[in-house]
Amino acid sequence: LAYSGLMENKEVTWMPAYGPEQRGGTANVTVIVSDERISSPILSKYDTAIILNQPSLAKFESKIKPGGTLIYDGYGIINPPTRKDIHVYRIDAMDEANERKMAKTFNMIILGGLLKIRPIVSTESILKALRKTLPERHHHLIPMNEEAIRIGMDIIKEE
């Protein structure tokens, strides 16, 4: 997503928190893609959040701006979001990826859902970024990733 934003000449920041959080906490990454200059990569409130598990929902649901967007995967959420002042979308990406025996494309299914409701960058930019960043030996996987993006666009549903 971030690389695709750069390819479209947008302002982009990418700030991961993948350290000790991976081992039992709420690993997260903040990506900002904007047509305007970004003053800080650190946010206290988010326009959009993609949430994949219950601990992350507990931590981040309250940090979405009123009128913002929350996308969640039904597989990892037992108690769905409760806020009424945000747009909530469910995408059953894990179930869909497993059903199609495409488990490694889970993230691309999620990305497809995001791009349907928030077309931050074009799908073509995503595919160009994959061609540019993936080693040549993995280029045969690009059509499967493109299919996963389309699946995500098809299965995301507003609640």
Please describe what each predicted stretch is:
Residues 1-159:
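Active-site cofactor/cluster-binding pocket
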